[in-house]
Amino acid sequence: MASRGVNKVILIGNLGQDPEIRYMPSGGAVANLTLATSESWRDKQTGEMKEKTEWHRVVIFGKLAEIAGEYLRKGSQVYIEGQLQTRKWQDQSGQDRYSTEVVVNIGGTMQMLGGRGGQDNAPSQGQGGWGQPQQPQASQQFSGGAPSRPAQQPAAAPAPSNEPPMDFDDDIPF
């Protein structure tokens, strides 16, 4: 069996700016995001904390792009699952340039993290319901083209009955 390889990127980070939304001639939406991922560690020699931030270009297509444009803002925390692609383009002087991006297409995922509360730039009540009290919900997940699975609900506890507990103290050996 020949292996075809795997091209899958998973990122959790914060948006560096509001998404840039454009529409293709076919009418499909395209969202461009800049996503920051950070890692921190303690320097073994000096003992001081160090931090490194990587910036990722993310391109989202279709309905997910429209959702990103509507709900994501600078600073939003988001989970992205897509594929790495490098495209070639020419700058104004005709020089070949390359850009590597995480592409979220059919089968990709964008999940908003970090909850809804406390955001200064969130719409007020009546504009999408973001300010209205709701059941606790930490994230919203959207999959590009893939059928989304309903969130699993915790199993309900059995209703208490009025019967006394069963006494299994019998002498049956099996």
Curated annotation (Swiss-Prot):
Stored InterPro entries: NA-bd_OB-fold, Primosome_PriB/ssb, ssDNA-bd
Species the sequence originates in: Proteus mirabilis
The encoding gene: ssb
Keywords: DNA damage, DNA recombination, DNA repair, DNA replication, DNA-binding
DNA-binding region (UniProt annotation): 55-61
Upper taxonomic lineage: Bacteria, Pseudomonadati, Pseudomonadota, Gammaproteobacteria, Enterobacterales
Keyword DNA repair: yes
Stated role: Plays an important role in DNA replication, recombination and repair. Binds to ssDNA and to an array of partner proteins to recruit them to their sites of action during DNA metabolism.
UniProt keyword Cell division present: no
Protein's recorded name: Single-stranded DNA-binding protein
A cellular-component GO term for this protein: nucleoid
PANTHER family: SINGLE-STRANDED DNA-BINDING PROTEIN
